[in-house]
Amino acid sequence: MSGSSSPSLWLAPNPSKRWGELFFLFYTPFWLTLCLGIVVPYKLYETFTELEYLLLALVSAVPAFVIPMLLVGKADRSLCWKDRYWVKANLWIIVFSYVGNYFWTHYFFKVLGASYTFPSWKMNNVPHTTFFLTHVCFLFYHVASNITLRRLRHSTADLPDSLKWCFEAAWILALSYFIAYLETIAIANFPYYEFVDRSAMYRVGCLFYAIYFIVSFPMFFRMDEKSTDEWDLSRVAVDALGAAMLVTIILDLWRLFLGPIVPLPEGQNCLQSGLPWFSN
């Protein structure tokens, strides 16, 4: 993984950001193969207890922090640890995915009819396992979005601003829905993440899930994209919290005005006042 700053239509001009994005891309096959290439197809999860599920998540997520600390990229050797892109990217995703798991999972329960039935230790009725697995998933999704958005901007550089905006908005919408749909399909063979109506989840629920990325992809892209505007960690955290708040507002507006996509079990009222994680 080169730290070179030579021009590229796909890769970041910032050497640290370029190295970080390439690292996250090259790391993705490890956890993806472990989870979807070994554990799920061979049904190893059938013997898992709470501990094994948590260990699987830790083995998937922890190297995203440890490897770049031990194998420092050429582009990062002259930088303080807090100025390295991989640190900032991890922090942004930690904040965003934590809010997503702790709060938005309850929208999946109340609006999409989802449920987790595998053995797990939980926080706010959300498995600890999902906090860690979501982190590496979202790192991959957002880096992939960065690369494609950068390429799109190069392709539309000579167009009027209004057309550039339209192309970018259309791409973000399409990519967000595609990733939401792809993830739903990818975990379909895992029987302990259930939906009341899986076909409704594929048709409509993926659009609900895509809201996460419609907000987060363009916001995450901005971080350290311009060499004259490098972010510090406090700005990274505040930006991620801002993105998370906007997603929360949109999800709750869906809950109140559009309601659930499936009939809810007796006793669950999606349209009640208040917030869904207060009423389990």
Swiss-Prot record:
Membrane-spanning intervals of the chain: 22-42, 53-73, 89-109, 167-187, 201-221, 244-264
Bilayer disposition of the protein: Multi-pass membrane protein
Keyword Transmembrane helix belongs to the record: yes
Compartments where found: Membrane
UniProt KW keywords: Isomerase, Membrane, Transmembrane, Transmembrane helix
GO CC, alphabetical: membrane
E.C. code: 5.5.1.9
One example GO MF annotation: cycloeucalenol cycloisomerase activity
Record carries keyword Magnesium: no
Catalytic activity: cycloeucalenol = obtusifoliol
Function summary: Converts pentacyclic cyclopropyl sterols to tetracyclic sterols.
Record-linked PANTHER family: CYCLOEUCALENOL CYCLOISOMERASE
Protein name: Cycloeucalenol cycloisomerase
Species the sequence originates in: Arabidopsis thaliana (Mouse-ear cress)
